[in-house]
């Protein structure tokens, strides 16, 4: 990946990386030999280096800061997101955490390898609750590292996008969506 070719969206990003055990094995759609955790780490580094405000958090049944920064190399970031085992995976945590902690977010990015709803509220409902409570027209980008036919984003909501797989165009696509260009 080349960090210089990604134009920033200029929005406040909250990246939520699935850190469940399944992310360390297998391959992602589009890049044979690349694990889901390594791909999410690479995307997180790109966002941290290009966006003016980016928080990178890990999730499964809990939500926590991964300590990943713009200064991290991809291999360092991969170490920070690999081997963390929590319980079941709850993709609503980014929105509920931001709401509870009064964090202003324009773009939530959830990176996972499979359908993830193990909580009390579905991610789509959590986003709507966040939007209503904050007045922010927050967007949701779900990056599915493996193609399992799932969707977390609501296909009828223009503020939500599902992306499956990974290639060099993924960061630019995400930035354009966050800016409202697509």
Identify the function of each model-found stretch.
Residues 1-182:
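Acidic, glycine-rich A-domain
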């Amino acid at each position: 990946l080349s960090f210089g070719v990604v134009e920033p969206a200029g929005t406040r990003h909250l990246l939520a990386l699935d850190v469940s055990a399944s992310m360390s094995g297998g391959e992602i759609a589009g890049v044979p030999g690349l694990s889901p955790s390594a791909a999410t780490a690479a995307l997180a580094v790109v966002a941290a280096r290009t966006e003016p405000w980016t928080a990178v958090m890990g999730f499964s049944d809990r939500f926590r800061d991964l300590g990943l920064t713009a200064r991290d190399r991809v291999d360092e970031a991969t170490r920070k997101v690999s081997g963390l085992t929590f319980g079941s995976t709850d993709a609503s945590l980014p929105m509920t955490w931001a709401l509870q902690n009064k964090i202003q977010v324009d773009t939530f990015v959830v990176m996972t390898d499979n359908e993830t709803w193990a909580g009390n509220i579905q991610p789509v409902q959590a986003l709507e609750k966040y939007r209503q409570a904050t007045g922010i027209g927050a967007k949701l980008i779900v990056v599915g590292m493996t193609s399992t036919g799932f969707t977390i984003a609501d296909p009828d909501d223009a503020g939500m996008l599902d992306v499956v797989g990974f290639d060099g165009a993924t960061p630019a696509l995400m930035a354009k969506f966050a800016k409202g260009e697509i």
